[in-house]
Amino acid sequence: MINKLNIVSGFKEGRSYLKDAFFTRPFRIADIKEDKTDPSLYLMLMSSSPGILDNDHYDINIQIESESRLMLESQSYQRLFNMQNGAVQQMNVSLADKSTFSYVQHPIVPHEQSIFKAYNVFNLTDNCSLTVGEIITCGRKHSGEVFLFSKFQNLTEVFHNGKLVVKDNVLLQPLLADVQTLGQMEGFTHQATLMYINTGIEDVESCIELAYAELQSEENIAFGVSKPFANGMIVRVLGNGGEQLYNAFRKIQRKLWIAEEKLNIKSQVTDLAENYI
């Protein structure tokens, strides 16, 4: 069954708003903005399903129009149930000039014999920002299910003006290869990735320092930060608790969001001054 979700985040009179939305079961979306004076758009992606089932096909399309800012949140942990054929999720996100998209989802819990593949494509133009985070757990650890899923794959591609700048492929097949070996999970049970790309700045060094400072205070994790190119940052974390990693990523996400908001305000003031002159 193909389950569809389409979102268009618009911008009008200095405020981001939900310009258009279409979804089929089990998807739902909710506006979760707390501060009505905040010009950004905050949406929660909700589902009436207990999780992703065998033969499910999720098709998610998100369009961020020029100058619009959207922070998308998930409702809860994403469960991948026992499968024979597998399930697929495709997400396509397009960011126009001076737009922002930020999405750190709750941890994914793959059940025994689950088979899942996600394919994410992000198309960026100039002066836009992307923050996306994902956390993969070992399964239902407290029920004795530790790396008993069949296959988990998450392939992400990021394009800037049509040019591929990042390709990230996470593939876990614990029944075929030992995931606890050196270079894999190394004794940890959770793996997390946070990706930040800003095509409007020349260097993300300050963002890397921000991520390091936040993660250094966390206990019982291993992490590293890489810079694939000047205005891109990828954070990798290994840990043993989904909630810990999720909260750490959310802290980094909020700080990046606030920093960008200040830059946007400064840019708008500069544009107004130039137009006045």
Swiss-Prot record:
Disulfide bonds: none annotated. Keywords: Chaperone, Cytoplasm, Nickel insertion. The keyword Calcium does not apply. UreD, UreF and UreG form a complex that acts as a GTP-hydrolysis-dependent molecular chaperone, activating the urease apoprotein by helping to assemble the nickel containing metallocenter of UreC. The UreE protein probably delivers the nickel. One of its GO terms (cellular component) is cytoplasm. Required for maturation of urease via the functional incorporation of the urease nickel metallocenter. It is found in: Cytoplasm. It comes from the Bacteria. Belongs to the UreD family. One of its GO terms (molecular function) is nickel cation binding. InterPro entries: UreD. The lineage of its organism: Bacteria, Pseudomonadati, Bacteroidota, Flavobacteriia, Flavobacteriales. The keyword Ribosomal protein does not apply. This is Urease accessory protein UreD. Transmembrane segments: none annotated.
